[in-house]
Amino acid sequence: MRRIVGDPWFYPVLFVAGGLTFMIAGTRLQQVGMIVAGLVLAGYAVTYRWAVRVRSRPFAGAQAHVEGGGVVVFWRPGCPFTRRLVTELTAQERERAYWVNIWQEPAAATFLAGLHEARDGHPHQAVPTAWLRRRDYVVATDATRARLKDTLRQRAGGDA
């Protein structure tokens, strides 16, 4: 189930299906409010897809990116913390980060668990996690999101 919910197409399809259901029911019941709600849901599917788009890259290049001064962000589709982070980043900031999907890359999931074990004393796969040359941290609060945004702005001239 988590693989279906985690696919990038899942929520847009769900919004469109819900929107169509509302529009059909609204048409049959002659309820303008339901038709409008259906249009809003269907429209949200389009904006959602654009707002949460990141380009996932292979884990094999992550180490070189970090050694070059870049930022690697481990993420998984469907994660509300990841979605909030992605929507708060600008398109340029999203492009500067090296995004690695831990559901598509089992080696990345294992590596992430090792990072957390070294820092926290127990392995886990909390995402989104930012990995830099000298540190790593879970990006789940306003303060850590601001910290990541500042880091990405500082690296604006560097390798993306």
What is the predicted function of each stretch?
Residues 1-59:
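N-terminal targeting signals for export/organelle localization
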Residues 57-98:
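Local sequence-structure signature of Cys/Sec-based thiol-disulfide redox active-site neighborhoods
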Residues 84-87, 110, 143:
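Generic recognition of short, well-ordered alpha-helical segments
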Residues 95-111:
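Thiol-based oxidoreductase modules, predominantly thioredoxin-like and allied folds used
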Residues 109-121, 149-152:
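Short amphipathic alpha-helix with an adjacent loop that forms part of the alpha/beta core around
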Residues 115-133:
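Structural micro-motif
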Residues 131-160:
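Non-catalytic, surface beta->alpha helical segment in thiol-disulfide oxidoreductase systems
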